[in-house]
Amino acid sequence: MDNFLKLKFRVESLMIVSLPIFMIISRFFLEFFLLIISFSFMVRVIKKNNYTIFKEYFSLFFLSLYVLLLLSFLFSDEKMNIISILLYFRFALYVFAILYFLKNEEHLLNYFLNTLLVLFFILFFDSLIQYIYGYNLIGLKIFETHRVTSFFGDEPILGSYIVKLFPFLLIFKEIINKNFKKTNYLITLAIFFSPIIIFLSGERSSVVLFFLMICYYLFFFIKTKKFKFIYFYVVFIILSTGTFLYNSDVYYDRYITQTMNSMFDKEARGNKFFLPKEYQDKNNFYLLSAQHQNFIYTGLNIFKENKLLGSGPKSFRYVCDNDNYKINEMSCNTHVHNYYLQALIETGLVGFVFIILTYLYIIYRSLKNFIKMLKGKFFSITEVIILGFYFTQLWPLMQTGSIFNNWNSIVLFLPIAFFLFFKEKKMKSINLVKPSKKKNILCF
């Protein structure tokens, strides 16, 4: 029986290790594995009658968020997403389940980070092949001439994937034992490969978020030994990006010409198509594009009728076609492509204040660590790395996915498990111990 339980625990740990893989190839199995892990975690907690793992501020934070979503849903007219909203608590379970396994499986962190490292290399070479030949390793065509998607196929989120998981590479670099020289070199190489993948993806939002993230880390890495290469890294990014834009008409058009036209050229075909003439005359420039400006006007019309608790979570797609809200036939989409605007529309002032306070807390923790650094006091690099992730992902003036999208929610909540894990360790560096060759098939 003990052998069976050990095997079961290892299989469940393997599911956690495979999460970055299933973020790419199967959202169904991504959620399925997380549900199995969470169910197993809850069975263990109930059997042992030990609920101390839930004694975190995150529990209060998530409970507040969950109650807010329920209230917004109950007072809304749209009831299409009742199952999705009721089961939203599962994301908190995912966090605590992963935290539990991190604390109880000695080498899980090592396996997880090594898996991620291998994935970054595979995605880099696959992206190059797709960019050069038009097909990737498994025959998937390039999405557009300027949109390399690798294994994501017709879903252009490769850049978003790299940006969201890039901080884990930095965590790996921070905590890896310095004696693992080969692994250290490979991590550094993957860090340098990352902006190339993001750039080839053609995702302008991901490129901006990556630059913003690097600027954030630049303030904290100036006094750290393991990240002394950060200055050379910034120069490398600027020179390589500039050189590529200069030599590629396709990417210059994507990143420069299209961006300038979508924001400042009222006569651009796309801008005239998305906004009625009376709305075009109101703007000297567009926030991101005329299409997004349309969503803003439509969203604000919805908000005016649902100020306190909004129109309900995930409701924009259902209410945007209402004649009282839309400004033309192009006013509808599945979401409004901005977390803050989505919070304001779908959860009202209460939800908007909630996300604002969350972001202010991130800034507060960041400033606290920065002051510690200036005074020469100890501060947690791993905490700073994760704060940098949320500082950029919740940056207000960006085009985003839906905050309630399952894939997006998983990726947004995942770092919290690691944040709580490192917080409990109360140390700057966790030297990964290399397991025996029989057990570790991933360590280099």
Task: Report residues per predicted region.
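Transmembrane signal-anchor hairpin modules in multi-pass inner-membrane enzymes, especially those
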Residues: M1-I83, Y100-N110, N114-L117, F172-Y185, ...
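Loop-to-helix entry and N-terminal half of a specific, functionally important transmembrane alpha helix
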Residues: V11-L19, Y57-Y66, L186-F192, T334, ...
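Membrane-embedded alpha-helical segments of multi-pass membrane proteins
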Residues: M15, I25-K47, I85-A97, I157-P167, ...
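Alpha-helical transmembrane segments of multi-pass inner-membrane proteins
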Residues: V17-P20, L93, N110-F143, S150-K226, ...
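Interfacial transmembrane-helix termini
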Residues: P20-I37, T52-F54, V67-F91, L102-Y111, ...
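Transmembrane alpha-helices of multi-pass inner-membrane enzymes
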Residues: I36-M42, I171, I214-C215, T358, ...
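A membrane-periplasm/extracellular boundary helix in multi-pass inner-membrane enzymes
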Residues: F125, L200-S201, F221-N283, Y297-E305, ...
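Long extracytoplasmic/lumenal interhelical loops at the membrane interface
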Residues: I142, Q280-T347
